[in-house]
Amino acid sequence: MAKEILFNIEARDQLKKGVDALANAVKVTLGPKGRNVIIEKKFGAPHITKDGVTVAKEIELTDAYQNTGAQLVKEVASKTGDDAGDGTTTATVLAQAIIAEGLKNVTAGASPMDIKRGIDKAVAKVVDSIKHQAEKVGDNYDKIEQVATVSANNDPVIGKLIADAMRKVSKDGVITIEEAKGTDTTIGVVEGMQFDRGYLSAYFVTNTEKMECEMEKPYILIYDKKISNLKDFLPILEPAVQSGRPLLVIAEDVDSEALTTLVVNRLRSQLKICAVKAPGFGDRRKEMLEDIAVLTGGVVISEEKGLKLEQATIEMLGTADKVTVSKDNTTIVNGAGAKENIKERCDQIKAQIAATKSDYDREKLQERLAKLSGGVAVLYVGAASEVEMKEKKDRVDDALRATRAAIEEGIVAGGGVAYIRAIESLDGLKGENDDETTGIAIIKRAIEEPLRQIVANAGKEGAVVVQKVSEGKGDFGYNARTDVYENMHAAGVVDPAKVTRVALENAASIAGMFLTTECVIVEKKEDKPEMPMGAPGMGGMGGMM
């Protein structure tokens, strides 16, 4: 495929047009009075959103050079969203500002490499300032509610729901988002450990109305192989039955012959028993069975540990206050495992979460941690139409991820104030040469831009507000929602420190790459020849024998 090449100022100018096209579409969504963006869909209703990364992901430009520039900034938005869960619009605004200021200086003859070094030095100082400004959230659910409210586009209902969900399942708990059947947004909480495996036979059901098998204080047998020979199973089945307590069997599988025997015994002798398949697959299954054992105070009967099924004793069985098994799920409530063992297991999983680089593995580990530490909350998002539903789910997702970021690194004053306060940390900073010092000045100017844009979206004059906020101290800032200058923490206008930090780091990283770019290579568009028209009079082949 043939390529086209552009160099120097010409290349950077084309890239900047793409940067501006994307950034201008994204930045209208910033702040409490940010506007909506409507995205046309080929099928179904258009998507209305105020989520920066959703807007960014939809943008593809026809000009290849400009599209390359747009994709650079799209990377800023999506990476910030992945790392911190929010701050995608802020990152885009910062990237555009750094690129615009930097490009002026590079065009005037400054050294791009020195400017980049100056930018990197300034960003490191600002990040330190943000970390010093950060205030830990701890168990203060009012602060958690404030963060969630701001990230959900100042929707106090969503903020309260997320704070309530965290109260119920703890800060480590899993909170998932699903679509509600009606228009109300509500919380559902699954207490205890739930895994997605149901009963192996409907004959195990004890509550025919709900089609569930309900067990009070059952023994729980945890086996990592298939039960195919009932003879091996009898030594543990008999004492469990004699105790008069129900028995839940969790195994890789149960052979049809063994299952039939269990069902017949269940029906004839009112033996309270239920069999379910073990959750997960491969190594993850082994870990999940170990989790269940720790939670219930039992032992995984595994040949890897030198334990065979026929050697199992009643002391090896786990137990819990209640177990409910439906067609699709098994829920274990109040397992009898020792608290210190559960805590130790949770700490192991937290260490694995910190070490893993795979997003999928991290998600699965967090699910396991939540199931051990408290339970799972489900936010059922309700709306009047499909369009509103998508927009609301975006906001709930933003708020939830921002809240997790706040718990991780604390909160700072919102509304762009944290960046304004960080400018002081750059006052004494000098580069090794004039161009490095210019790079520092670029960051000084660029970190005012989020506040300017929030104010502009609220219909006010940015320069005036930036000046007034700069003259203030501490958490003093401009609340665009109420059009009042006040203490941002007291007003509940707060941002997660992690979001503020990551947005700037990612913006500066891409802007630095942009400014040090000297050549752009794109694929040359081939002019496709038009399809030839069919010759007239070729409609049929009449007269042929």
UniProtKB/Swiss-Prot annotation:
Residues reported to bind ATP: T29, L30, G31, P32, K50, D86, G87, T88, T89, T90, G415, D495
GO cellular component: cytoplasm
Catalytic activity: ATP + H2O + a folded polypeptide = ADP + phosphate + an unfolded polypeptide
Domain of life: Bacteria
One MF term in the entry's GO annotations: unfolded protein binding
Family matches, as InterPro entries: Chaperonin_Cpn60_CS, Cpn60/GroEL, Cpn60/GroEL/TCP-1, GroEL-like_apical_dom_sf, GROEL-like_equatorial_sf, TCP-1-like_intermed_sf
GO terms for biological process, alphabetical: protein refolding
SUPFAM superfamilies the UniProt entry points to: GroEL apical domain-like, GroEL equatorial domain-like, GroEL-intermediate domain like
CDD domains in UniProt: GroEL
Localization annotation: Cytoplasm
Transmembrane portions of the chain: none
Pfam families recorded: Cpn60_TCP1
Keywords, comma-separated and alphabetical: ATP-binding, Chaperone, Cytoplasm, Isomerase, Nucleotide-binding
Free-text function comment from the UniProt entry: Together with its co-chaperonin GroES, plays an essential role in assisting protein folding. The GroEL-GroES system forms a nano-cage that allows encapsulation of the non-native substrate proteins and provides a physical environment optimized to promote and accelerate protein folding.
NCBIfam families the UniProt entry points to: GroEL (TIGR02348), PRK00013.1 (NF000592), PRK12849.1 (NF009487), PRK12850.1 (NF009488), PRK12851.1 (NF009489)
Quaternary structure (record): Forms a cylinder of 14 subunits composed of two heptameric rings stacked back-to-back. Interacts with the co-chaperonin GroES.
Record's protein name: Chaperonin GroEL
Taxonomic source organism: Bacteroides fragilis (strain ATCC 25285 / DSM 2151 / CCUG 4856 / JCM 11019 / LMG 10263 / NCTC 9343 / Onslow / VPI 2553 / EN-2)
Encoding gene per record: groEL
